[in-house]
């Protein structure tokens, strides 16, 4: 009799995705982040669900309800800290996952890559509306500043902003709808993750060499289930260390004060994982230009597959492109640092140079390096 795992309609899907999946034998730990992101999503949905049971989305009680969760609900402090820091771990894994995709040429699976970029945007939107919910000072002013960017859209901008706000300022209507969005978006993300996996399993995984791995594949279970379990253990350890010992390390001190529309914080800035995009936004002294640059900083990922000029898929054997990749990584760290600094010299000029370099590396330097490496591969005799 055939194994039920291979015949049952539902079990068969799980089996083909996580058990008998033919996987390249040489994929490194950089391929762990997909499963880690899946676990992050589950953690965020579960902790979020328990927080939603006690949270009230009203301007008068939102801040107090979060304090109530931390003080009076059994393990409420832990659930909240896991949720807040889980978001940071989520974004660390996301950035590493995207970085891996760029380094090893995984973007050449265009459908998988495109749905991945849309996923990244959706997760960023989810995190943004979620940050508004505790209704602290930075929550309120962050929401005000970022939603206000839409007013840069010609003709319809102001109307659009007031439509999103549900009034003439960020108020009760805004908070209520942001809570509704924050609740529904993770489930939309989950559906998109399934589509992401569906497209990935059409082609199979890429591998560090960038060569066709069909000749040498091994079953996902037990080889990669155990390998993913190690990564999972390390991620959970990092999350628990953060949540237990320094839960407020990545947050903003201004968010300990309830939202006050009459008092603007000295430095309005988003959570650390948006700072690179925020720095790009601020580096352009024109509102509409800044908004377009902000959008392009993420949407540029969609054009990367069309800018691939090399005969090799991966950067594994391409030292010039490797150098540019790590320069881009350093540039993103610089932008993240600048995004958290006040708007004054020398930070303004550093931010502008870093922003130009970001787009220059992706649009011009990497494709040129690919062509140069192709030329260097040609026999010269």
Swiss-Prot record:
Q: Pfam families from the entry? A: Cytochrom_B_C (PF00032), Cytochrome_B (PF00033)
Cofactor section:
heme b
Please report which protein family the annotation says this sequence is part of: Belongs to the cytochrome b family.
Q: Which residues bind a ubiquinone?
A: 201
Primary gene name:
MT-CYB
Protein name per the record: Cytochrome b
Q: Name one GO molecular function term.
A: ubiquinol-cytochrome-c reductase activity
Q: Name one GO cellular component term.
A: respiratory chain complex III
